Curated annotation (Swiss-Prot):
Its EC number is 5.4.2.10. Belongs to the phosphohexose mutase family. GO terms for biological process: carbohydrate metabolic process; peptidoglycan biosynthetic process; UDP-N-acetylglucosamine biosynthetic process. The active site is at S99 (phosphoserine intermediate). This is Phosphoglucosamine mutase. Catalyzes the conversion of glucosamine-6-phosphate to glucosamine-1-phosphate. Pfam families: PGM_PMM_I, PGM_PMM_II, PGM_PMM_III, PGM_PMM_IV. It comes from Wolinella succinogenes (strain ATCC 29543 / DSM 1740 / CCUG 13145 / JCM 31913 / LMG 7466 / NCTC 11488 / FDC 602W). The lineage of its organism: Bacteria, Pseudomonadati, Campylobacterota, Epsilonproteobacteria, Campylobacterales.
Amino acid sequence: MKLFGTDGVRGKAGEKLTAFSAMKLGLAAGIYFRKQSKTNKILVGKDTRRSGYMIENALVSGLTAVGYNVIQIGPMPTPAIAYLTEDMRCDAGIMISASHNPFDDNGIKFFNRFGFKLDEEAEREIEAIYADEALLEASQKSGKEIGASKRIDDVVGRYIVHIKNSFPKELSLHGVRMVLDTANGAAYKVAPTIFSELGAEVFVINDAPNGHNINESCGATQPLMLSEEVKRVRADIGFALDGDADRLVVVDERGEVVDGDKLIGALAMHLKNSHTLEKPLAVATVMSNLALEEFLAKAKIKLLRAGVGDKYVLEMMQKEGANFGGEQSGHLIFSDFAKTGDGLVSALQTMAFVLRSGERASRALNIFDLYPQKLVNLPIKQKKELKEIEGFEALMSEIESQGFRQLIRYSGTENKLRILLEGKDGRALEKWMERCVEFFKATLGG
Protein backbone atom coordinates (compact mmCIF):
# COMPACT_ATOMS: atom_id res chain seq x y z
CA MET A 1 0.00 0.00 0.00
CA LYS A 2 1.50 3.34 -1.08
CA LEU A 3 0.91 6.15 1.39
CA PHE A 4 3.87 8.47 0.89
CA GLY A 5 4.24 10.91 -1.98
CA THR A 6 7.05 13.35 -2.70
CA ASP A 7 6.59 15.10 0.65
CA GLY A 8 5.05 12.79 3.21
CA VAL A 9 1.45 11.60 3.27
CA ARG A 10 -1.01 14.04 1.76
CA GLY A 11 -4.64 14.17 0.65
CA LYS A 12 -8.09 15.65 1.14
CA ALA A 13 -8.86 15.77 4.86
CA GLY A 14 -11.79 13.53 5.72
CA GLU A 15 -11.50 11.65 2.42
CA LYS A 16 -8.04 10.22 1.75
CA LEU A 17 -6.67 11.44 5.07
CA THR A 18 -9.26 10.47 7.67
CA ALA A 19 -9.18 10.22 11.45
CA PHE A 20 -9.00 6.44 11.11
CA SER A 21 -6.10 6.48 8.62
CA ALA A 22 -4.24 9.03 10.76
CA MET A 23 -4.63 6.80 13.83
CA LYS A 24 -3.37 3.80 11.87
CA LEU A 25 -0.44 5.86 10.63
CA GLY A 26 0.31 6.85 14.22
CA LEU A 27 0.35 3.17 15.19
CA ALA A 28 2.59 2.23 12.25
CA ALA A 29 5.01 5.12 12.74
CA GLY A 30 5.17 4.45 16.47
CA ILE A 31 6.04 0.79 15.87
CA TYR A 32 8.73 1.81 13.38
CA PHE A 33 10.37 4.45 15.60
CA ARG A 34 10.24 2.32 18.78
CA LYS A 35 12.58 -0.19 17.13
CA GLN A 36 15.34 2.43 17.36
CA SER A 37 14.03 4.48 20.27
CA LYS A 38 16.40 6.49 22.46
CA THR A 39 14.03 8.65 24.53
CA ASN A 40 10.49 7.34 23.84
CA LYS A 41 9.38 10.90 22.94
CA ILE A 42 7.83 12.15 19.70
CA LEU A 43 7.20 15.80 18.88
CA VAL A 44 4.04 16.79 16.98
CA GLY A 45 3.27 20.17 15.41
CA LYS A 46 0.81 21.44 12.83
CA ASP A 47 -0.17 24.40 10.70
CA THR A 48 -3.45 26.32 11.01
CA ARG A 49 -5.88 24.13 9.02
CA ARG A 50 -9.13 23.23 10.75
CA SER A 51 -8.56 19.54 10.00
CA GLY A 52 -5.26 19.68 11.89
CA TYR A 53 -7.05 19.14 15.21
CA MET A 54 -8.79 16.00 13.96
CA ILE A 55 -5.62 14.55 12.47
CA GLU A 56 -3.47 15.50 15.47
CA ASN A 57 -5.79 13.82 17.97
CA ALA A 58 -6.04 10.67 15.85
CA LEU A 59 -2.30 10.52 15.24
CA VAL A 60 -1.52 11.00 18.93
CA SER A 61 -3.99 8.22 19.79
CA GLY A 62 -2.04 5.83 17.59
CA LEU A 63 1.34 6.90 18.96
CA THR A 64 0.33 6.65 22.61
CA ALA A 65 -1.40 3.31 21.98
CA VAL A 66 1.97 1.74 21.13
CA GLY A 67 3.60 3.34 24.18
CA TYR A 68 5.02 6.64 22.93
CA ASN A 69 4.99 9.81 24.99
CA VAL A 70 3.96 12.70 22.75
CA ILE A 71 4.79 16.39 23.01
CA GLN A 72 2.26 18.60 21.20
CA ILE A 73 3.41 22.15 20.42
CA GLY A 74 0.57 23.49 18.28
CA PRO A 75 0.98 25.68 15.19
CA MET A 76 4.67 25.96 14.27
CA PRO A 77 6.61 26.05 10.98
CA THR A 78 7.74 22.75 9.48
CA PRO A 79 11.44 23.70 9.88
CA ALA A 80 10.77 24.40 13.56
CA ILE A 81 9.65 20.80 13.99
CA ALA A 82 12.82 19.59 12.27
CA TYR A 83 15.00 21.75 14.54
CA LEU A 84 13.15 21.08 17.80
CA THR A 85 13.03 17.31 17.25
CA GLU A 86 16.81 17.16 17.55
CA ASP A 87 17.08 19.99 20.09
CA MET A 88 14.57 18.34 22.46
CA ARG A 89 16.12 14.87 22.02
CA CYS A 90 13.00 13.28 20.56
CA ASP A 91 12.97 10.00 18.64
CA ALA A 92 11.03 11.66 15.82
CA GLY A 93 9.13 14.75 14.81
CA ILE A 94 5.82 14.90 12.97
CA MET A 95 4.38 17.91 11.14
CA ILE A 96 0.71 18.00 10.16
CA SER A 97 0.51 20.22 7.10
CA ALA A 98 -0.19 20.28 3.38
CA SER A 99 2.26 23.17 2.92
CA HIS A 100 1.09 25.46 0.09
CA ASN A 101 -2.03 23.41 -0.76
CA PRO A 102 -5.61 24.64 -0.12
CA PHE A 103 -7.08 24.38 3.39
CA ASP A 104 -9.14 21.25 2.68
CA ASP A 105 -5.97 19.26 1.99
CA ASN A 106 -3.73 18.12 4.79
CA GLY A 107 -0.66 15.98 5.23
CA ILE A 108 1.73 14.29 7.63
CA LYS A 109 5.52 14.67 7.38
CA PHE A 110 7.98 12.67 9.47
CA PHE A 111 11.45 13.63 10.68
CA ASN A 112 14.02 11.32 12.26
CA ARG A 113 15.74 12.14 15.56
CA PHE A 114 18.37 14.20 13.76
CA GLY A 115 15.73 16.44 12.16
CA PHE A 116 15.96 15.01 8.64
CA LYS A 117 13.01 13.88 6.54
CA LEU A 118 12.70 10.11 6.27
CA ASP A 119 14.29 8.40 3.30
CA GLU A 120 12.26 6.21 0.95
CA GLU A 121 13.38 2.99 2.65
CA ALA A 122 11.94 4.17 5.98
CA GLU A 123 8.73 5.27 4.28
CA ARG A 124 8.31 1.86 2.64
CA GLU A 125 8.82 0.16 6.01
CA ILE A 126 6.12 2.31 7.64
CA GLU A 127 3.78 1.48 4.74
CA ALA A 128 4.41 -2.23 5.26
CA ILE A 129 3.63 -1.94 8.98
CA TYR A 130 0.49 0.09 8.18
CA ALA A 131 -0.79 -2.76 6.00
CA ASP A 132 -0.08 -5.45 8.64
CA GLU A 133 -3.29 -5.51 10.70
CA ALA A 134 -2.08 -8.30 12.97
CA LEU A 135 1.09 -6.38 13.87
CA LEU A 136 -0.87 -3.18 14.54
CA GLU A 137 -3.19 -5.07 16.87
CA ALA A 138 -0.45 -6.99 18.68
CA SER A 139 1.71 -3.87 19.26
CA GLN A 140 -0.85 -1.91 21.26
CA LYS A 141 -0.08 -1.48 24.95
CA SER A 142 -2.24 -1.59 28.05
CA GLY A 143 -2.21 -0.19 31.57
CA LYS A 144 0.89 1.77 32.55
CA GLU A 145 2.58 0.98 29.23
CA ILE A 146 0.21 3.27 27.31
CA GLY A 147 1.97 6.51 26.45
CA ALA A 148 1.08 10.00 27.68
CA SER A 149 0.66 13.24 25.78
CA LYS A 150 1.14 16.83 26.88
CA ARG A 151 0.96 20.26 25.29
CA ILE A 152 3.89 22.66 25.63
CA ASP A 153 3.53 26.27 24.53
CA ASP A 154 6.90 27.75 25.46
CA VAL A 155 9.16 26.00 22.92
CA VAL A 156 8.63 28.81 20.41
CA GLY A 157 11.36 30.80 22.18
CA ARG A 158 13.98 28.15 21.36
CA TYR A 159 13.17 28.38 17.67
CA ILE A 160 13.17 32.20 17.66
CA VAL A 161 16.64 32.30 19.22
CA HIS A 162 17.89 29.70 16.74
CA ILE A 163 16.62 31.67 13.74
CA LYS A 164 17.99 34.99 15.03
CA ASN A 165 21.39 33.36 15.47
CA SER A 166 21.48 32.63 11.73
CA PHE A 167 21.65 36.37 11.01
CA PRO A 168 25.19 37.84 10.95
CA LYS A 169 25.93 39.52 14.28
CA GLU A 170 27.54 42.58 12.67
CA LEU A 171 24.35 43.42 10.75
CA SER A 172 21.10 44.99 11.92
CA LEU A 173 17.65 45.42 10.42
CA HIS A 174 17.23 48.86 11.99
CA GLY A 175 15.92 51.24 9.35
CA VAL A 176 14.62 48.43 7.12
CA ARG A 177 10.95 48.70 6.19
CA MET A 178 9.50 45.33 5.23
CA VAL A 179 6.18 43.66 4.54
CA LEU A 180 5.65 40.11 5.75
CA ASP A 181 2.91 37.82 4.39
CA THR A 182 2.51 34.82 6.70
CA ALA A 183 -0.20 33.18 4.52
CA ASN A 184 -2.49 32.80 7.57
CA GLY A 185 -0.26 29.84 8.31
CA ALA A 186 2.05 28.27 10.84
CA ALA A 187 4.44 31.25 11.14
CA TYR A 188 1.78 33.88 11.78
CA LYS A 189 3.10 34.54 15.31
CA VAL A 190 6.76 33.62 15.17
CA ALA A 191 7.78 35.40 11.94
CA PRO A 192 6.82 38.98 12.90
CA THR A 193 8.49 38.51 16.29
CA ILE A 194 11.83 37.53 14.74
CA PHE A 195 12.05 40.46 12.33
CA SER A 196 10.82 42.99 14.87
CA GLU A 197 13.34 41.84 17.48
CA LEU A 198 16.13 42.27 14.91
CA GLY A 199 15.09 45.90 14.46
CA ALA A 200 12.97 45.97 11.30
CA GLU A 201 9.83 48.02 10.86
CA VAL A 202 7.42 45.21 9.99
CA PHE A 203 4.06 45.47 8.24
CA VAL A 204 2.29 42.12 8.54
CA ILE A 205 -0.50 40.86 6.28
CA ASN A 206 -2.46 37.60 6.31
CA ASP A 207 -1.70 36.83 9.96
CA ALA A 208 -5.24 36.00 11.16
CA PRO A 209 -5.82 32.27 10.55
CA ASN A 210 -9.37 30.99 10.97
CA GLY A 211 -8.87 27.36 9.95
CA HIS A 212 -9.78 27.73 6.30
CA ASN A 213 -7.97 30.85 4.99
CA ILE A 214 -4.47 29.36 4.95
CA ASN A 215 -2.81 30.13 1.56
CA GLU A 216 -6.08 31.69 0.35
CA SER A 217 -5.11 34.28 -2.29
CA CYS A 218 -1.96 34.99 -0.31
CA GLY A 219 1.46 33.69 0.68
CA ALA A 220 4.29 32.33 -1.41
CA THR A 221 2.09 30.86 -4.14
CA GLN A 222 0.03 34.03 -4.66
CA PRO A 223 2.20 37.08 -3.86
CA LEU A 224 0.03 39.74 -5.57
CA MET A 225 -1.28 41.08 -2.26
CA LEU A 226 2.29 41.31 -0.95
CA SER A 227 3.41 43.21 -4.05
CA GLU A 228 0.59 45.72 -3.65
CA GLU A 229 1.30 46.21 0.05
CA VAL A 230 5.04 46.75 -0.55
CA LYS A 231 4.20 49.54 -2.98
CA ARG A 232 1.49 50.99 -0.75
CA VAL A 233 3.69 51.38 2.34
CA ARG A 234 6.86 52.07 0.31
CA ALA A 235 8.71 49.19 1.88
CA ASP A 236 12.30 48.22 1.10
CA ILE A 237 11.43 44.56 0.60
CA GLY A 238 8.65 42.03 1.07
CA PHE A 239 8.68 38.37 2.11
CA ALA A 240 5.93 35.80 1.56
CA LEU A 241 5.88 32.45 3.34
CA ASP A 242 3.68 29.49 2.54
CA GLY A 243 1.35 27.70 4.95
CA ASP A 244 4.07 25.81 6.81
CA ALA A 245 6.83 28.44 6.29
CA ASP A 246 9.37 26.21 4.58
CA ARG A 247 9.16 28.27 1.38
CA LEU A 248 10.03 31.92 0.66
CA VAL A 249 9.11 34.34 -2.11
CA VAL A 250 10.80 37.75 -2.21
CA VAL A 251 9.33 40.99 -3.58
CA ASP A 252 11.61 43.98 -4.21
CA GLU A 253 10.83 47.62 -3.38
CA ARG A 254 9.11 48.09 -6.75
CA GLY A 255 6.64 45.31 -5.95
CA GLU A 256 8.29 42.92 -8.41
CA VAL A 257 8.59 39.24 -7.50
CA VAL A 258 12.22 38.09 -7.52
CA ASP A 259 12.63 34.95 -9.63
CA GLY A 260 13.56 31.91 -7.54
CA ASP A 261 16.59 31.05 -9.68
CA LYS A 262 17.91 34.61 -9.38
CA LEU A 263 17.49 34.32 -5.62
CA ILE A 264 19.47 31.06 -5.59
CA GLY A 265 22.22 32.73 -7.63
CA ALA A 266 22.35 35.77 -5.36
CA LEU A 267 22.46 33.71 -2.18
CA ALA A 268 25.17 31.41 -3.54
CA MET A 269 27.24 34.53 -4.25
CA HIS A 270 26.42 35.86 -0.77
CA LEU A 271 27.82 32.70 0.82
CA LYS A 272 30.88 32.72 -1.41
CA ASN A 273 31.63 36.40 -0.72
CA SER A 274 31.24 35.89 3.04
CA HIS A 275 33.48 32.79 2.89
CA THR A 276 30.75 30.51 4.21
CA LEU A 277 30.21 28.40 1.08
CA GLU A 278 31.90 25.17 2.19
CA LYS A 279 32.67 23.99 -1.34
CA PRO A 280 32.35 25.78 -4.72
CA LEU A 281 29.03 23.95 -5.16
CA ALA A 282 25.33 24.76 -5.07
CA VAL A 283 22.46 22.34 -5.60
CA ALA A 284 19.28 23.17 -7.52
CA THR A 285 16.81 20.96 -9.39
CA VAL A 286 16.17 19.93 -12.96
CA MET A 287 13.59 22.76 -13.05
CA SER A 288 16.19 25.53 -12.66
CA ASN A 289 17.02 27.83 -15.55
CA LEU A 290 20.15 27.15 -17.58
CA ALA A 291 21.12 30.81 -17.08
CA LEU A 292 21.60 30.12 -13.35
CA GLU A 293 24.07 27.36 -14.15
CA GLU A 294 26.00 29.63 -16.52
CA PHE A 295 26.01 32.54 -14.05
CA LEU A 296 27.40 30.40 -11.23
CA ALA A 297 29.98 28.82 -13.55
CA LYS A 298 31.41 32.29 -14.23
CA ALA A 299 31.85 32.67 -10.47
CA LYS A 300 33.53 29.25 -10.36
CA ILE A 301 30.59 27.69 -8.52
CA LYS A 302 29.39 24.37 -9.93
CA LEU A 303 25.63 23.86 -10.05
CA LEU A 304 24.41 20.32 -9.37
CA ARG A 305 20.85 19.32 -10.27
CA ALA A 306 18.68 17.05 -8.11
CA GLY A 307 15.18 15.72 -8.64
CA VAL A 308 12.25 17.97 -7.78
CA GLY A 309 11.61 18.21 -4.04
CA ASP A 310 13.63 19.76 -1.22
CA LYS A 311 14.23 16.26 0.17
CA TYR A 312 16.19 15.36 -2.96
CA VAL A 313 18.06 18.66 -2.92
CA LEU A 314 19.17 17.95 0.65
CA GLU A 315 20.17 14.37 -0.21
CA MET A 316 22.44 15.63 -2.98
CA MET A 317 23.85 18.35 -0.72
CA GLN A 318 24.78 15.72 1.87
CA LYS A 319 26.23 13.40 -0.76
CA GLU A 320 28.37 16.12 -2.36
CA GLY A 321 29.28 18.06 0.80
CA ALA A 322 27.45 21.26 -0.23
CA ASN A 323 25.92 23.56 2.38
CA PHE A 324 23.52 25.48 0.14
CA GLY A 325 20.82 24.45 -2.30
CA GLY A 326 17.27 25.16 -3.28
CA GLU A 327 14.35 25.04 -5.65
CA GLN A 328 13.15 27.91 -7.81
CA SER A 329 9.79 27.55 -6.03
CA GLY A 330 11.37 29.06 -2.91
CA HIS A 331 12.52 26.06 -0.89
CA LEU A 332 16.04 27.12 0.11
CA ILE A 333 18.28 25.02 2.35
CA PHE A 334 21.13 26.51 4.36
CA SER A 335 22.40 23.36 6.03
CA ASP A 336 24.56 25.32 8.50
CA PHE A 337 21.29 26.46 10.09
CA ALA A 338 18.51 24.08 9.04
CA LYS A 339 17.84 20.44 8.12
CA THR A 340 15.15 21.40 5.62
CA GLY A 341 13.91 24.46 3.76
CA ASP A 342 13.29 27.32 6.20
CA GLY A 343 11.58 30.46 4.92
CA LEU A 344 12.72 32.54 7.89
CA VAL A 345 16.39 31.58 7.62
CA SER A 346 16.15 32.26 3.88
CA ALA A 347 14.63 35.70 4.47
CA LEU A 348 17.39 36.66 6.90
CA GLN A 349 20.12 35.45 4.54
CA THR A 350 18.49 37.46 1.74
CA MET A 351 18.52 40.54 3.96
CA ALA A 352 22.19 39.96 4.79
CA PHE A 353 23.03 39.84 1.07
CA VAL A 354 21.05 43.00 0.28
CA LEU A 355 22.50 44.94 3.23
CA ARG A 356 26.07 43.98 2.37
CA SER A 357 25.54 44.94 -1.27
CA GLY A 358 24.58 48.50 -0.33
CA GLU A 359 21.99 48.42 -3.14
CA ARG A 360 18.21 48.44 -3.27
CA ALA A 361 16.72 44.93 -3.43
CA SER A 362 15.72 45.35 -7.09
CA ARG A 363 19.32 45.93 -8.11
CA ALA A 364 21.03 43.58 -5.65
CA LEU A 365 18.89 40.56 -6.51
CA ASN A 366 18.61 41.09 -10.27
CA ILE A 367 22.13 39.94 -11.08
CA PHE A 368 21.67 37.94 -14.29
CA ASP A 369 19.12 37.48 -17.07
CA LEU A 370 17.10 34.29 -17.42
CA TYR A 371 16.37 32.38 -20.58
CA PRO A 372 12.66 32.37 -21.45
CA GLN A 373 11.01 29.57 -19.50
CA LYS A 374 7.37 28.59 -19.24
CA LEU A 375 5.75 26.28 -16.73
CA VAL A 376 2.16 25.07 -17.00
CA ASN A 377 0.47 23.03 -14.27
CA LEU A 378 -2.15 21.19 -16.30
CA PRO A 379 -5.09 19.56 -14.44
CA ILE A 380 -5.55 16.01 -15.75
CA LYS A 381 -8.01 13.17 -15.21
CA GLN A 382 -5.54 10.27 -15.28
CA LYS A 383 -1.83 9.54 -14.92
CA LYS A 384 -0.25 7.27 -17.51
CA GLU A 385 3.38 6.25 -17.92
CA LEU A 386 4.57 9.11 -20.12
CA LYS A 387 6.74 7.00 -22.41
CA GLU A 388 3.77 4.73 -23.12
CA ILE A 389 1.64 7.60 -24.47
CA GLU A 390 1.55 7.37 -28.25
CA GLY A 391 3.36 10.31 -29.81
CA PHE A 392 5.04 11.46 -26.57
CA GLU A 393 8.64 10.62 -27.42
CA ALA A 394 8.29 11.98 -30.96
CA LEU A 395 6.99 15.30 -29.61
CA MET A 396 9.80 15.56 -27.04
CA SER A 397 12.44 14.79 -29.67
CA GLU A 398 11.02 17.47 -31.94
CA ILE A 399 11.10 20.04 -29.12
CA GLU A 400 14.71 19.22 -28.24
CA SER A 401 15.80 19.29 -31.89
CA GLN A 402 14.66 22.93 -32.02
CA GLY A 403 17.03 23.85 -29.17
CA PHE A 404 14.55 23.81 -26.28
CA ARG A 405 14.94 22.10 -22.92
CA GLN A 406 11.88 20.19 -21.70
CA LEU A 407 10.88 18.62 -18.42
CA ILE A 408 7.53 16.85 -18.16
CA ARG A 409 6.50 15.26 -14.88
CA TYR A 410 3.45 14.51 -12.76
CA SER A 411 2.81 16.34 -9.51
CA GLY A 412 3.46 14.07 -6.56
CA THR A 413 0.60 15.56 -4.54
CA GLU A 414 -2.09 16.64 -7.03
CA ASN A 415 -3.76 15.43 -10.24
CA LYS A 416 -1.64 17.72 -12.38
CA LEU A 417 1.00 17.41 -15.09
CA ARG A 418 3.85 19.91 -14.84
CA ILE A 419 5.11 21.00 -18.27
CA LEU A 420 8.34 23.01 -18.34
CA LEU A 421 9.87 24.38 -21.54
CA GLU A 422 12.96 26.58 -21.79
CA GLY A 423 14.84 28.16 -24.67
CA LYS A 424 16.25 31.38 -26.09
CA ASP A 425 13.32 32.17 -28.44
CA GLY A 426 10.34 33.32 -26.36
CA ARG A 427 7.81 33.39 -29.21
CA ALA A 428 8.63 29.90 -30.40
CA LEU A 429 8.50 28.75 -26.77
CA GLU A 430 4.87 29.90 -26.47
CA LYS A 431 3.90 27.96 -29.62
CA TRP A 432 5.57 24.77 -28.41
CA MET A 433 3.83 25.11 -25.04
CA GLU A 434 0.44 25.47 -26.76
CA ARG A 435 1.17 22.32 -28.72
CA CYS A 436 2.21 20.43 -25.56
CA VAL A 437 -0.92 21.49 -23.66
CA GLU A 438 -3.16 20.40 -26.54
CA PHE A 439 -1.34 17.05 -26.77
CA PHE A 440 -1.66 16.25 -23.05
CA LYS A 441 -5.27 17.44 -22.83
CA ALA A 442 -6.10 14.98 -25.59
CA THR A 443 -4.13 12.07 -24.12
CA LEU A 444 -4.67 12.57 -20.35
CA GLY A 445 -8.10 14.18 -20.28
CA GLY A 446 -7.05 17.65 -19.19
